[in-house]
């Protein structure tokens, strides 16, 4: 059984980032709600516990708290921000409203004789975000960091292995944060760098073999990262017992359907059924302009097509799904099981009698990509950009027609090709063309034109939650613009979206 660190969620915005930082140290961790009972925590047998930040005050009404017994488990605890204040409050320290609030980059003085700050400079920069502060540390605790306005920026009870920091070590703005995290995990908890994607894949493949036996499985394959990695992992475990159903709704990017079929059918020798359903989907979308209605129609039609194809395959016992850890955390479900009864996951019908195989439900997105590379999936597929489930239907504003799809598909292909030629693929989080349902007057040759406008969208981001518009060199934008106007029939104007998120979303619909 692998060693485990528990991250107790108190509602902070960086909670998943804390878990990712722990995993980056080669240590497995899980996020649990603060309502988890002491009995459940004992059953998990953690080697370390981390309290996250949160938006509350320890003195507020109905504020998140937990049983003080957690400090008597002889397990090292690290409290971060609110978690630090809660530790102080529960153990008899004094928490109060800070006379001066601290937000953003802050100079901090560290006592690097502490195990927590071993090997770190005494004068550092950290990221603060708090309105309350610890005015007095609990009895038995030593102050090991301070700022000009925060007398207890970090504290420790070395004997009980209890540590608290007011700042956020998990964010990039705290440069020493990951070194501090390693000190806590390795030197204080006694853990080792043993959690790797190679070992995870090996364990999971063996587990799937044991669960499935000689039964048959199906997988709804979209060509996206999550479903692709899940399908390949299960295929490596059970081979031809798995059949993948690829519903080609005609809303994919240029040549994408053919690429998916080639990679998985030929490259991995999978049983793959490709359902060419473009006419069926476009028929359902005829006359529909509202984006939410488009999404709903596409989702419902996908279910129907998938159900019809699954029904032709006979006795199927398992459904493979590419659920990943953020989905699990956000739904508040337990993370321990690789298999559970199917219950309308992903909108699939209630009466589909499958058990669910979710081989990636313990992994974050970056870990899924790493596993994909371990499994031999082509780099360009593992690192493909996010692509919405409804596909190009939400990049064609207004009614979706075959002609409009062809325009946005060709424009998008040119944009992606030129970004690749400019060597900018790894610098831009997402980039695509959109057809905003605008026509404008132009002149081509000596004739007046009245044609489509194509919008180009490119953003930089680390997680997609917020983003900035990408400052692509003018010469690249110029070349893209000229190529689209000259090579894509029915386009006479190109615009570039220079809006960040927020206020805009990345997609236009």
Swiss-Prot record:
Catalytic activity: XMP + L-glutamine + ATP + H2O = GMP + L-glutamate + AMP + diphosphate + 2 H(+)
PROSITE patterns: GATASE_TYPE_1 (PS51273), GMPS_ATP_PPASE (PS51553)
EC number in record: 6.3.5.2
Enzyme class, broadest EC rank: ligase
Residues the record lists as binding ATP: 222-228
GO cellular component, one term: cytosol
Active site, per annotation: 81, 168, 170
Domain (GMPS ATP-PPase): residue spans on this chain: 195-384
Matches recorded under CDD domains: GATase1_GMP_Synthase, GMP_synthase_C
Annotated ranges, domain Glutamine amidotransferase type-1: 4-194
GO molecular function terms listed in the Swiss-Prot or TrEMBL record: ATP binding; GMP synthase activity
Pathway(s) this gene product operates in, as recorded in its UniProt entry: Purine metabolism; GMP biosynthesis; GMP from XMP (L-Gln route): step 1/1
Keywords: ATP-binding, Glutamine amidotransferase, GMP biosynthesis, Ligase, Nucleotide-binding, Purine biosynthesis
SUPFAM superfamilies from the UniProt entry: Adenine nucleotide alpha hydrolases-like (SSF52402), Class I glutamine amidotransferase-like (SSF52317)
SUBUNIT field: Homodimer.
Function: Catalyzes the synthesis of GMP from XMP.
Protein name per UniProt: GMP synthase [glutamine-hydrolyzing]
Source species of the chain: Clostridium perfringens (strain 13 / Type A)
Species lineage: Bacteria, Bacillati, Bacillota, Clostridia, Eubacteriales
